[in-house]
Amino acid sequence: MPDPSTYRPAPGSIPVEPGVYRFRDPHGRVIYVGKAKSLRSRLNSYFADLSGLAPRTRQMVMTAAKVEWTVVNTEVEALQLEYNWIKEFDPRFNIRYRDDKSYPVLAVTLNEEFPRLKVYRGPRKKGVRYFGPYSHAWAIRETVDLLTRVFPARTCSAGVFKRHNQIDRPCLLGYIDKCSAPCVGRVSAEQHRQIVLDFCDFLAGKTDRLVRDLERKMTAAAEDLDFERAARLRDDIGALRRALEKQTVVFGDGTDADVVAFADDDLEAAVQVFHVRGGRVRGQRGWIVEKSGEPGESGEGQLVEQFLTQFYGDQAELGSAGDNAGDSGQDEATNPVPRQVLVPCLPDNADELTEWLSQLRGSRVALRVPQRGDKKALFETVQRNAKEALAQHKLKRAGDFTARTAALQSIQDTLGLADAPLRIECIDISHVQGTDVVASLVVFEDGLPRKSDYRHYAIREAAGDGRSDDVASIAEVTRRRFYRHLHDTQHPTELSAEGKSRKFAYPPNLFVVDGGAPQVNAAQAVLDELGISDVAVIGLAKRLEEVWVPSGSDLGPEPIILPRNSEGLYLLQRVRDEAHRFAITYHRSKRSKRMTASALDSVRGLGEHRRKALVTHFGSVARLKEASVEEITAVPGIGVTTARAVLEALGVPQAAPADSDTAAAVIDDDQRRVTG
């Protein structure tokens, strides 16, 4: 472990200006990013007295081998640079947000001729309007199901829409009036777009106007003695009011705000955010924050600063990736940064943080602490949610941690390992009668799956042409995995090309293969060949769940039988089953690609884009096979020569054209390539 005195900057060499600093480990990986009003004052605090540092900070300083900094002009610039570096390097010692899954939003695809309503996760796209986020996808579907009674907008995929257009018959939603069925021309594109825009206006908070319009239409229908239409409009108004009841008014002045609250202990903090738009709670999100232990960083003010920086920085990136076009312009309901952000306390750099948030929003943002009235009442509700979330997380973690500790201890004791197997890797082979032979490698750390480290392999040497050798396949995968580890260990400079870690730099404590004695011995032979002696190898056989160890082991030649109620056996089963699942998933994907390979793949000069255009135009390869050359050339980018080559590849006999016809076809094909 590096000695901090070996990389401490010389006295007086650190500038006193504001800036951002990075600590790197011996391999050049960035392990911590921070900012400071005075770089000299902050960095000197890390080296003055190690015993006075928080345990996590002391570990960071002892792990690091280098510190570097960048001077900036203002604290706002420091805030932005710190955020960018944390996003780029994901330093292990910075505050991390766990359980920050991709929350679903309701997307309205206004960039399509017939806009669609759908549940969506991922980066924002141009011309699409977003509402949310919602805590669950079912909440979006429930909202859409309720509102499509009044706003019968399209919710189907492009494939379903095209199929019903071709058969000229609407889907079930069209028959029950929950879709206006633009696929069969029941409404025009302009009429359908207006339905969708009214839907967007309702979700954006423009509810009073829509309800008044419906009430006016209901009254007019009743006066015209059209009681059936009046009754339908009455039911529509009731549906809208039920939807509004689900979004209780919390701010009578119609404020747009995010309300942020924390609940914390010495190690972690729970964060809860309520999104209020138009005075109504439109969404809620929550995280568990691991506190870093950095001096002054674990206080509530620092938690507020760190959270707002990361949360709104991410939201602004999503928003800029999908700047809405034309009639889908961003409004108060969809702007990632609201007019007000209510927090439990103001951080020390509240002015700089407010300026940065205002820049993200494009107009003034107020950062406030609620003191009284509706805002104070809602803040207390959010805070209760945060306390409940932290309590539930600690209860769940305590149970999980106890079980995982018992499982790792059981495996250590059973196998006679010097240490608990904190990192377990498992490989499994999957194939069907020797075809598409693949392998998976899954990783568990501290008894939990680490999916970012998962790998899959296509078997190259030990299988192929209908033959398969599971033992040789195990040996091949083991060699490829540990050869990579040895290479990374012997060439550490290659790890820091971008300052980011390469996961295979870390070997497992326990290597598990799916199988019995032959598979275990094959894996152990590879490790012996590579000179690796600090990795334990076992096999887990499905029959009786026997644990096999390599031949010559001190544990004897017979398999080990763990008790059925053993936590250790349960963990090994989970690891083995996860490897099996991951291998089958990859095998099915590879087999599917092979089985769906089209005869069109062999047509020279016909790329993926034009192949897709052909199949889309005709609906299937079978219909394409029945088409004539003239019909095929109607597809943009397809000339006569290519059309004949397509039919030839599909086994359709072609009459030999006359020389003049051939020349004309070539010229025509060339012209199409140029103009297309």
UniProtKB/Swiss-Prot annotation:
Matching Pfam families: GIY-YIG (PF01541), HHH_5 (PF14520), UVR (PF02151), UvrC_RNaseH (PF22920), UvrC_RNaseH_dom (PF08459)
SMART domains reported for this sequence: GIYc (SM00465), HhH1 (SM00278)
Assigned GO CC terms: cytoplasm; excinuclease repair complex
Keyword Cytoplasm attached: yes
Keyword Transcription regulation: no
Keywords, sorted A to Z: Cytoplasm, DNA damage, DNA excision, DNA repair, Excision nuclease, SOS response
Alphabetized SUPFAM superfamilies for the sequence: C-terminal UvrC-binding domain of UvrB, GIY-YIG endonuclease, RuvA domain 2-like
Domain UVR: 208-243
Localisation: Cytoplasm
Matching CDD domains: GIY-YIG_UvrC_Cho (cd10434)
Chief subcellular location: cytoplasm
UniProt domain GIY-YIG: residue ranges: 16-95
One GO process term, biological-process aspect: nucleotide-excision repair
Superkingdom of the organism of origin: Bacteria
A GO molecular-function annotation: DNA binding
Function: The UvrABC repair system catalyzes the recognition and processing of DNA lesions. UvrC both incises the 5' and 3' sides of the lesion. The N-terminal half is responsible for the 3' incision and the C-terminal half is responsible for the 5' incision.
Quaternary structure note: Interacts with UvrB in an incision complex.
Family: Belongs to the UvrC family.
Protein name from the UniProt record: UvrABC system protein C
Natural source organism: Mycobacterium sp. (strain KMS)
